[in-house]
C-alpha cells in the first residue's frame, strides 16, 4: 500500500468535480485506489510512509481518444499541408516502415514512453495495417501497465500498394489480435475495429467490419469529415450515400 498527500482534484462522477486540499490518496499494492480522503482513516497502518507533495496538485491521468502511434515521428512536420497531401507525402511512407517488426518495436516503445511521461495513461490508438507491429504495440501498452484500445488499420484502396490489406487479411489479423489480448492481456488493453476512412476502404471492407463489430461487440474508430477536400472526395467515391 502507498499513501500520497497533495491537493487532489478529481471527478467521482461525470458531472461532479471535487477538490480536497491536502488530502490523501491510498493505493493498494495492485495499483487500484483504495480511497481518497480528507483525513486518513484510523484503521490504516500509520507506520507506512506518506509521500507528501506539499502544495502540488494531483489529478487523474489524461485520456487521448484519438492518436496515431506510427505518426510519432511526424509530430509537427509539414503542418502547412492539408490532410490528403500530408498523408501521401509524409504519413503513408512512414507507416510503410512498420512492416519491419524491429522498426515498429523501437518506435512504438518511444511512443508509449512519451505517453507515459506526459501522464496519458489511456488511449484509443491507430496502428498500421501490419498485424505483427500492431501486436507489438498492444504488448508494449500491457508491459507499461497502461490502458488502450489498439486498432489494426483497414485500407484497401486509394493508398500505396505497400500499405493495403485485403478484407480477408484484415479480419484474420483482427481475430488474431483479439485472441492474443484475450489470452495474454490484463483487461486494460483491448482491440478496436479501425477502418482508416471511407476513401481508403471499399464498401466490401466496411460492410465486413460492420458485421464483425456486430458479431463481437468491439468498438469502432475511424475518421469523418476532417476537411472540405476529404468531404468532396467522399461524395465522388460514394455518390449514393447521403447524410
Predicted regions and their residues:
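Divalent metal-coordination and catalytic microenvironments
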Residues: 7, 25, 31, 55, ...
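Flexible loop residues that form catalytic
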Residues: 12, 68, 128
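Residue-level detector of flexible, active-site-proximal loop/helix-junction positions
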Residues: 40, 57, 155
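N-terminal metal-binding scaffold of metallo-dependent hydrolase/deaminase domains
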Residues: 1-45
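Alpha-helical scaffold segments that flank or form the walls of functional sites
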Residues: 26, 75-146, 171-186
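N-terminal-biased segments
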Residues: 58-100, 163, 167, 222-233, ...
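Metal-coordinating catalytic core of metallo-dependent amide/deamination hydrolases
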Residues: 132-243
Amino acid at each position: 500500500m502507498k499513501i500520497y498527500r497533495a491537493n487532489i482534484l478529481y471527478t467521482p462522477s461525470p458531472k461532479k468535480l471535487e477538490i480536497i486540499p491536502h488530502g490523501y490518496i491510498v493505493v493498494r499494492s495492485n495499483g487500484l485506489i483504495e480511497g481518497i480522503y480528507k483525513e486518513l482513516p484510523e484503521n490504516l497502518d500509520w507506520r507506512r510512509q506518506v509521500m507528501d507533495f506539499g502544495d502540488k496538485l494531483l489529478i487523474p491521468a489524461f485520456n487521448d481518444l484519438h492518436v496515431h502511434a506510427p505518426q510519432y515521428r511526424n509530430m509537427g512536420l509539414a503542418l502547412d499541408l492539408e490532410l490528403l497531401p500530408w498523408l501521401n507525402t509524409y504519413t503513408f511512407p512512414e507507416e510503410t516502415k512498420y512492416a519491419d517488426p524491429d522498426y515498429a518495436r523501437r518506435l512504438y516503445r518511444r511512443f508509449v514512453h512519451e505517453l507515459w511521461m506526459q501522464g496519458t495513461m489511456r488511449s484509443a490508438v491507430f496502428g498500421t495495417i501490419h498485424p505483427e507491429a500492431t501486436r507489438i504495440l498492444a504488448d508494449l501498452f500491457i508491459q507499461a501497465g497502461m490502458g488502450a484500445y489498439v486498432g489494426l488499420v483497414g485500407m484497401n484502396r486509394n493508398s500505396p500498394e505497400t500499405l493495403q490489406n485485403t478484407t480477408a487479411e484484415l479480419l484474420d489479423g483482427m481475430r488474431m489480435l483479439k485472441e492474443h489480448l484475450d489470452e495474454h492481456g490484463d483487461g486494460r488493453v483491448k482491440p478496436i475495429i479501425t477502418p482508416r476512412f471511407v476513401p481508403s476502404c471499399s464498401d466490401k471492407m466496411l460492410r465486413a467490419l460492420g458485421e464483425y463489430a456486430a458479431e463481437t461487440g468491439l468498438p469502432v474508430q475511424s475518421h469523418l469529415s476532417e476537411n472540405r477536400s476529404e468531404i468532396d472526395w467522399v461524395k465522388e467515391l460514394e455518390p449514393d450515400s447521403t447524410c
